[in-house]
Every structure is written in C-alpha cells, then in structure tokens.
C-alpha cells in the first residue's frame, strides 16, 4: 500500500512520482491512498508510523519507508522481489 500525494497517474509531488515510478518498474499491481483526498489519514499516519513525510510504502503491514528508501531498494534490486513476494502471499 502506497500512501502518496495524488494518484499513480497524477502524482502531486516529485517524491510520490519517484516512488510510483520505482514500484511500476517492478511490474506489480499495488494499492494506493491519496492522502490529499483523505486529510484524516494525512494527519494520523505520520504519528502512527513515526515517519513524518509522504509517500509511505507499506508491505504486509510493515512500513518500508519513503521515496529515498524505495528508490534505493529499487536500484539495489531489493524492491521487486519483496513486492512480488507480498503479491504472491
């Protein structure tokens, strides 16, 4: 689940756009929540996750991180197997 600003087709910030690019390049379907359309989630999720910024990627209920971590994992070849494993589960 990607909590992001905007939608995958219309990201509303560069960080969300970069996260979507990396995830889509892995070739897996993913769910997302547009936090701009859900102000309650936008306010509460950073307190819950102890992660102050968006996007936030969760896999199997666990926070993976934001845009920088997603991009780093993608570049190191770690993101795709993790996402494929989650989709297969």
Curated annotation (Swiss-Prot):
Binding-site residues, glutathione: 5, 42, 54, 67-68
Domain Glutaredoxin positions: 1-89
Secretion signal, residue range per the UniProt entry: none
GO MF term (any one): metal ion binding
Keyword Iron: yes
InterPro entries from the UniProt entry: Glutaredoxin (IPR002109), GRX_PICOT-like (IPR033658), Monothiol_GRX (IPR014434), Monothiol_GRX-rel (IPR004480), Thioredoxin-like_sf (IPR036249)
Matches recorded under Pfam families: Glutaredoxin (PF00462)
Residues at which [2Fe-2S] cluster binds: 13
Sorted UniProt keywords: 2Fe-2S, Iron, Iron-sulfur, Metal-binding, Redox-active center
PANTHER family associated with the record: GLUTAREDOXIN FAMILY MEMBER, MONOTHIOL GLUTAREDOXIN-S14, CHLOROPLASTIC
Family under the similarity heading: Belongs to the glutaredoxin family. Monothiol subfamily.
Protein name per the record: Probable monothiol glutaredoxin GrlA
Taxonomic path: Bacteria, Pseudomonadati, Pseudomonadota, Gammaproteobacteria, Legionellales
């Amino acid at each position: 689940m990607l909590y992001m600003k905007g939608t995958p087709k219309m990201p509303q910030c560069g960080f969300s756009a970069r996260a979507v690019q990396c995830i889509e390049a892995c070739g897996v379907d993913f769910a997302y929540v547009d936090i701009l359309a859900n102000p309650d989630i936008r306010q509460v999720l950073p307190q819950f996750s102890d992660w102050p910024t968006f996007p936030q990627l969760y896999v199997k209920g666990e926070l993976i991180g934001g845009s920088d971590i997603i991009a780093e994992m993608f570049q190191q070849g770690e993101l795709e197997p993790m996402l494929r494993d989650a989709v297969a589960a």
